[in-house]
Each structure stands twice: as structure tokens, then as C-alpha cells.
Amino acid sequence: MSTSHHHHHPPYLITTLFFLFLNFSCLHANELELLLSFKSSIQDPLKHLSSWSYSSTNDVCLWSGVVCNNISRVVSLDLSGKNMSGQILTAATFRLPFLQTINLSNNNLSGPIPHDIFTTSSPSLRYLNLSNNNFSGSIPRGFLPNLYTLDLSNNMFTGEIYNDIGVFSNLRVLDLGGNVLTGHVPGYLGNLSRLEFLTLASNQLTGGVPVELGKMKNLKWIYLGYNNLSGEIPYQIGGLSSLNHLDLVYNNLSGPIPPSLGDLKKLEYMFLYQNKLSGQIPPSIFSLQNLISLDFSDNSLSGEIPELVAQMQSLEILHLFSNNLTGKIPEGVTSLPRLKVLQLWSNRFSGGIPANLGKHNNLTVLDLSTNNLTGKLPDTLCDSGHLTKLILFSNSLDSQIPPSLGMCQSLERVRLQNNGFSGKLPRGFTKLQLVNFLDLSNNNLQGNINTWDMPQLEMLDLSVNKFFGELPDFSRSKRLKKLDLSRNKISGVVPQGLMTFPEIMDLDLSENEITGVIPRELSSCKNLVNLDLSHNNFTGEIPSSFAEFQVLSDLDLSCNQLSGEIPKNLGNIESLVQVNISHNLLHGSLPFTGAFLAINATAVEGNIDLCSENSASGLRPCKVVRKRSTKSWWLIITSTFAAFLAVLVSGFFIVLVFQRTHNVLEVKKVEQEDGTKWETQFFDSKFMKSFTVNTILSSLKDQNVLVDKNGVHFVVKEVKKYDSLPEMISDMRKLSDHKNILKIVATCRSETVAYLIHEDVEGKRLSQVLSGLSWERRRKIMKGIVEALRFLHCRCSPAVVAGNLSPENIVIDVTDEPRLCLGLPGLLCMDAAYMAPETREHKEMTSKSDIYGFGILLLHLLTGKCSSSNEDIESGVNGSLVKWARYSYSNCHIDTWIDSSIDTSVHQREIVHVMNLALKCTAIDPQERPCTNNVLQALESTSSSSSSCTTYLSKILSLA
């Protein structure tokens, strides 16, 4: 009997496969729903997530930013740099069961991150990067067992670092830098035995550096800079044998440098600058043969640099400036083949500069200024052919400048002032094509300097030397901003080439032997701020064209042989503050306008035939010459009567014109039916009939918008501090039309309340349009606002403080011009995020307070980050924004701090310049902030040419 075999699948196998398929489908559907839920909570203006939608296939593996494994499960979500905003409302997306990587860095996401993100996220998660956003709130507690990388840097997180951070036992990378974290660095970090990279920089951490860090034997990178850490550096750090990078800068660390740091044989970067370290540098430090960059600057270190420095054969950068180091500069530095940057300035080094310095090095920057160095310059300094900065000022160096520097074509910045150099300039020195800054002042240099060819030159100071001959032709130096040739023996006339400086701001030719007339063409230098031609032999008249100067502040023509009358329109230069015309041959009357109104007697003395009706000038009064003839008497009487009549008529018009030009007109008073008395003060006559008290009060019911009979719109705002209004009205009287200031047209007040009426400009607030603005438009906004500030600070006397420079207070009109709505003190609420430290603490408001607010505005325009929520302000976020910016800028990660919508490839150099300016404007000490004129000059002088930006050189290249 034959037997047939039939194969049947057991029913339980079919059932199992069915449920597996069902489970697979459910998982797939669950992933899709979680991802779409994430998409619904954020804004995606550039439509990067357009592929995230229901479709016939519903295959999430094809979606932008999503990566799946070989069984089509989502393992990676990378949406970095997509310009997305909004909040992550739940941690649901983080629960995708196979998810290993989440990267949401470099966006504009904000708000707190979900509190359960570290307790409910997928246990498979290994990489979490939320850096460079605007997240706030505290860092959640919890534990992810397999997490390798946690990067929350460059956000606005607050609060303390919890001790349970120590349970993330698998972490290799922890970066919490660039936030507003407070409290101590937890010692529990020592439990992260596998950690390789630790960054807590640019926060507000206090206390000491925990000794427990010495247990983290796998650490390669420690960055705790830009905090408020104190105490001594733990010697236990010297036991971290794998350490490559140690950075503790900008803290309050004190005491000696532990000798154990010399045991870090793999160390390549050691940065301890800007602390309070003292004592000698341990000799063991100079045995670190792998060290590339060493920076102990800005401390109180003493002692000498040993010859052991010759062992550091990998060293490229040595920074020991601003300490109390003594002795000679060791010969050992000359044998460091890779040495590029040597900065030892502001110490007490003595003796000569090592004879072969530069011969066996690769020098690009040498700064030994402000020491006690003597002797001559080595002729080997530029042997590498790469030397760009040579800074040796304020020493006692002598002899001639070596001929080799005349052939150093790489030089860009040379500062040799305040030494004892003598002899002639080396051949070729005045034809170096890349030099942009040259200061040789206060030496004993001599010779003829009539040949000059430096096309990149921006600043030249040859003052206090013995140069002679005629003035050079600087026609090739179109970029010159400052030229100081004072206190030499230069003769001859001013050459025509001197009139062709489109950017010159400071011109000083004083104390020479220059002759001839002052060229009228000099007035074509529209950016000239300071002009000093004193103590020469100029003849002829003061050019009337000088009235065309637009920003001239100081004018000194004293001690010449100038004759004729002073041009009457010279006093019309609004920016002119100081004038000195003493000791000339001038005659006639002194102008009674502008800077001449308060001129000091010493500034006009020595002009025998000069007179003035201003007794404070010390000049004799101007007298009318009288004759005795009867005909003359009748002529005088008739003329006097005619003049009186003319004065009477003119006076009426002058008063009228004065009222109109100063925008001060009669006060309108009205009493309403309920007995309330109102006063309306107008500042422009054309609006006097535009609205009444009733229409002003009615506008308060219609979104505070007032429309006159011609359809012109105005905005009505309530004055917050009524008592301040009278003194504020005097401020408003100073304001005339300026294209970058919203015009205040009137005030309306009763005994209990007051309102301010200003024009309503068609356009949008800066806060509404900032995202996505091109660099060109941002530049225009910066310049427009600082021009408004210059008008308020420099053209109004006394100066007017703008007060509020937040993007909410700046309107971009239809012509793309920024318009500042004045926040006069006492009138409009200040935005605390833009408030200077002295204003917050002492209620002091000055022009330097405005500069601080402008600096914050620059940071906002550069980074796209703002700090305007009340919670952030109470936590000191605007201070943290500045600290974060300093941290980011000092490391020059331009792509991490610049707004992603700005094209850095074209404007990188200009952006870096503006960031540097922003940090100067936000200095804690008001005295360290630049004045408004300097801010404007800095903005105008920035160029968009590209420049290299390495990790550390950006800091050092801005120092000298």
C-alpha cells in the first residue's frame, strides 16, 4: 500500500504570522502618527517637512530627515538647520521604539523641553542634539541608559545641573555650554567614567572645579570657561592621561597652577586666561611636547620663562601677556619651528629681543609691547615670509628699523611707537602693499618721506619724530581714516593728493613748517571729525567751504598766519564742538552761532583785530565808527530808524520761524462739560487743526489709532509717569525731523493723565520681519538706528536718551528705512532685555545705556536670538545672551552663532567685525563702551571681504 504525504501548516503558525503582521502594521501606523504629531506642533516656513503627510504608501522612510533600518523602522531623525520654530509639546516623538538619533540643532525652537523626555524616550536613544535653539526652563531629570551624546548647548536653559546627571553612565559627550545654568558643578559628574567631552562653558556656574573630575580617566576635553568659578585648580586634573584640551578661561580661579598639569602628556590646548592665578609657571608645563596652544594671559603670574620652553616643539601659539613676568625672553623660543604667534605684552620683560627670533620660527604675529625691552630689532623677524602683525610699542628699543622689514610684504599691522628708533625708514618700507595700520610715533626717526604707496593703509601715525621735506602724496591710500604727522619738520604746501581721502576722520598736521593757503578742497573729506592744522605757517583766509563739513567736531587752526574774517557760516556746522583760532591775524567780528557761542577766551586770543559782542570771549566789543558831519548824522538816524523797523518786522518772522523750526507752538486749552481741563501741546504747526481733545480721547476706544480729516494716521500712547512729562517736553522740543526717528507731533494732558501722539508709519515692526532678512537689510537697519542715536546724543544739547531699542520699538517703513519710536525716560516702558546693567541696578540712563541696548540689538540681528519673556529677564537672560555671544565668538564657530538665514560665505569678515562691535557695546562698564560717533564709524568702516577665521586666532588678532 502506497502512502502519500500531505504538508499542512499548523493553524498556530498562521495565527502567529498574522499577529506579527498586525503588530508590524500597528508599529508602522504608530510611527506615522507620532511624526505627524511632531510636525503639527512646529512652524516650518521653508517647507522642509512637505513630504511628511498621509499618502497612498504612507512610507515614513521616504520622508525628509527620516532614516530607517533594514526592517523599515525609524532609527534617526535629523532636522538640523531647517529654520523651524515652535515648541516641542510632548515627548511622544522621542518614544519611537527603534529611535537611536535625534538632531534638532540650529533651529529656532523655543519653550521648555518635555519634562519626561529622559524618562519616557526610547531606551534605544544614543544621540540627542537640541543645541543652538531658544529652549528655556530647567533641564529635566531622568535617565537614558544607552545615551552616548547629550548636546543642549547654546540655548536659554536655567536652573542647576542636577546630581542625577551622574547616572547617565554611558555618556561620551556632554555639552551644556552657552546657557544660563547656575549653582555648582556637581561632583557626581565624576561617575561618568566613560565621558570623553565635557563642556559647561558660558553659564553662571559658581563654586570650585570639583576634584571628582580627576576620576574621569577617559576625558579628552574639558571646557568650563566663561563662568564664575573660584578656588584653585584641582591637582587631580593632572591625572587625566587622555586629556587633549583644557579650557578654564574667564573665571575667578586663584592660587598657583598645579605642577601636575605637566603630566598631561597628550595635552594639545591649555587655556587658563582671564583668571586670578598667581605664582610661577611650573617648569613641568614647558615639557609638554604635544602642546599646540598655551594661553595663561590676563592673570597675576610672576617669575621667568625658563629655557625649557625649547622642548615644546609642537607649540604654535604662546600667550603670556598681561601678567607680571620678568627676566629675559628666553633664547629657546627661537628654536620652536611651528611657532606662529608669540604674545608677551604687558609684562616686565627686560633685555633684548632674542637675536634669531623668526629665523627658525613660522611667525605670523609678534607682540612684545609694554615691557622694558632694549637693544635693536633682529633682522630675522620676517624670515618666514608670513609675519602680519609686529607690535613692539612702549619699550626702550633703539637703533634703526632693520632693512629686512622694508621687504616684509606680508605685514599688515605695525606698531613701533614710544621707543627710541632712529635713522631713516628702510627702503621699501613705505611701499608695503598690505599694511593697513602703521604707528611709528614718538621715536627719533628722520629723513624725507615724500614717497608713499600703501593702498590698504587706514591709519598712519608718524607724529613726534624728525621727518622733514614736503608732505607725501597719499593719493594711493584711499582708505585712510587717520593721518597724524604732527610734531615733525615737514614743510612745503599741502599737496592736492591730500584732498582725496573719502574716508578720513582724523587729520593732524600740527607743529610742522607747512606753508601756503589751506586748500578749500579739504572740505570734500565728508567724514572728517578732527582737523588740526595748528602751529604751522598757513596764510590766507579760512576757507568758507569748511561750512560743508558734516561731522566735524574739533577744529584747531591756532598759531598760524591766517588773515581775513572768520566765515560767518562756520558756526553753522552742527557737529562742531571745539574751535581754536588763536594767534593768527584774523579781523572782524566773531560769529555768534554754534560752537562760537561758548568759545573759551584762550581759543581766540592773539588776534588783535578780532572783536565780539560775547564778553566771555575776552575780545574787545565791536564798535560802530561814527563821523561828525551833519549829513552822516542824518544818515545814521535814518538808517537806525529803518533798521529798527526792519528788526521789528524781522523779529516777528524770526519768532514765527523759531517756533516752527523748533516745533514749539502755543498750547491749546479746553474745558470739557464734566469740568476736566485739557492742554494740547503741538510740535508742528501743520497738525494744529488735525485733531482735538475729543478726537484724541475717542481714539482710545479704537485701538489707540487717531485719523485726522486728511486720512493721516497717528498713534496715541499713555504716558506712564505723568510727573515726568514737563521735563520730557523740553526733550521733545530738541527733536527735529530725522528719517530714522518716528515723529512726535503733540502731547495731550489733564491734571491726572497724559497722552503722547506720534505719527503712525506704514510698515512692520522689526520683530515681525527679522527672520529671513538678508545681511544687506540688516546692515541698513544697524546704520539707520545708530544714525538716529548719533542725532539724539550728539546733535541735541543736552543729549536725549532713546531708552528702548528693542525690535518691538523699531518700525521698518515702506521705503525699508528703520524708524525708532522714542522711549524717552518716564514716557514709555523699557524692555528689560535691552536695559544696561547700570539702568537695572541704579536706574541710571545715559547715552552709554543706549549703546548697551544697541549692542543687544546687534546681537539680535546677528544671531536671530532674543530674550524678551519676563521669565527670561528675571533670570538675567540678556546678560546670558552677551556671555553666550562672547563664548561663541571667542571660539569663532561662526556657523553656530550666526542666524542661519545670513549668507556667511560672502560677508564673513564684516559679520565678525560687527560681532566684535556688539561685544564692545555690551561691556559691563559704561566707560568701556564706545561713543555713538565711534559706533557709526566702526559700522561704516566694516567691509564684506572674506577673511579666514580659525578656532583661536580670531581672539588674538583683535587684541593689538
From Swiss-Prot:
Locations listed in the record: Cell membrane
Extracellular side: 30-634
Taxonomic classification: Eukaryota, Viridiplantae, Streptophyta, Embryophyta, Tracheophyta
Primary enzyme class: transferase
Effect of a null allele: Insensitivity of pollen tubes to CLE43 and, partially, to CLE45 peptides-mediated growth stimulation. Pollen tubes of plants missing both SKM1 and SKM2 are fully insensitive to CLE45 peptides. Reduced seed production at 30 degrees Celsius, but not at 22 degrees Celsius.
Phosphotyrosine modification, residue list: Y834
Protein name per its UniProtKB record: Leucine-rich repeat receptor-like serine/threonine-protein kinase SKM1
Pfam annotation, one family: LRR_8
Gene: SKM1
Gene3D superfamilies, per database record: Ribonuclease Inhibitor, Transferase(Phosphotransferase) domain 1
SMART domains tied to this protein: LRR_TYP
Binding partners and assembly: Self-interacts. Binds to CLE45 present in the pistil, particularly under relatively high temperature (at 30 degrees Celsius).
Entry-annotated residues carrying Phosphothreonine: T692
LRR repeat feature ranges: 71-96, 97-120, 122-146, 149-168, 169-194, 196-216, 217-240, 241-264, 265-288, 290-312, 313-336, 338-360, 361-384, 386-408, 409-432, 434-454, 455-477, 478-501, 503-525, 526-549, 550-573, 575-598
GO BP field: regulation of pollen tube growth; response to temperature stimulus
